[in-house]
Amino acid sequence: MSRKSQNRLAPRAWSFSRGSFLALVLAWFLLVPGSALAGEPRGDATIFIYHHFGDERYPTTNVGMDQFREQMAYLAVHDYQVIPLAELVASLHDGKPLVPKTVVITIDDGYRTIFSEAWPVLRKYGFPFTVFLYVEGLERGYPNYLTWDQVEEMAAAGVDFQDHSYSHHRLADWPPGMKEVEYRRWIRADLARGAAIMERRLGVKPRFFAIPYGEYNDVVLSEARKAGYEAAFTQDAGSVSDDTELFLIPREPILGTDWASLEHFRQVLERIDLPFADMTPDFAPLRENPPARFGARLLYPERYRSDSFGIFVSELGWQQAILEGDWVYIDNETSLNRRINRVMISARERDSGRTALRFWMLTNPSAP
């Protein structure tokens, strides 16, 4: 094995304020000029995550159907290999090199427009896809969600269904005053309930877990492993490489206006992973505030242009980073006030000029 080891009825992806959301969009577009799209493809994969299809009631998590058709046509015309999620996970688990231009399509929550809008398009192209189900939404018959009859029809036709938890709680929100043993028990019970219902309904125990809202900490990931899942998926943007951790697999959200455009879709496909380890701060609940430093140890520092490294923190924006040996970092004196921050390290690949990046998440239990 390689190094990888609405409202209530409408769970939303990405818990950013509008300002930080737009700041992140701007940072990405600044980092990916047209020249970065050149070069031979490396064996990285892209996992897309969708939510609503053709449902303008939910503009922040919706993709228009004209946009979706255009995106699927782009994959077909440009010879991208759209593979089942299980095939990608098997490659990571076995240390098998990834094939260039590999794509996986995932859809979170289980809204009814998957059945009425997305499935006919995906079936037209013969593209496999995985739906991560918010189990309580189906069990209680919430409006806009798939019915179990629809799920069973799709499953019989080969659609893959996996677990997105029972309650869709923000599992990384460690309740104040709750002891760790109680916190773990709460997470464990929710995961077990959702998985048991899926197994009873579909006859198969779910193998993969998409973390609700993409929000995690070390306890959430630990309990996902203990629950018997083979892999866990975040909503951190980024590509998948041979060095991707099995319980921190990133996915690229396609939603809203800018992030559902074909331009953004193409840019996402051209990005590559930037493998690193020993992040500071790591993704355990924040222990020091302000964090004295943001950074990580690069696994392959020689791959990248030494003057191209930058670090983005949701609350602080993008800064030019310092590279010392295999360490890349920025020093910091500013306290973090948000409950969730995402940290990104980015650079330009030396040979191709393409943008390489990777994210991780910080949780701040003391935030209001």
Where are these regions (language model features)?
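Acidic, His- and aromatic-enriched active-site or binding-groove loops in soluble protein domains
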Residues: 229-238
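N-terminal secretory signal peptides that target proteins for export/translocation
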Residues: 1-17
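Bacterial N-terminal signal peptides
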Residues: 20-33
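Short, compositionally biased P/S/T/A/G/V-rich stretches that sit at domain boundaries
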Residues: 254-289
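N-terminal pre-catalytic segment of deacetylase/amide-hydrolase enzymes
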Residues: 36-103, 269-281, 352-368
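Beta-strand-enriched, solvent-exposed domains that form extended recognition/catalytic surfaces
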Residues: 276-368
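Metal-dependent polysaccharide deacetylase catalytic core of the NodB/CE4 family, i.e.
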Residues: 43-59, 78-81, 99-103, 111-219, ...
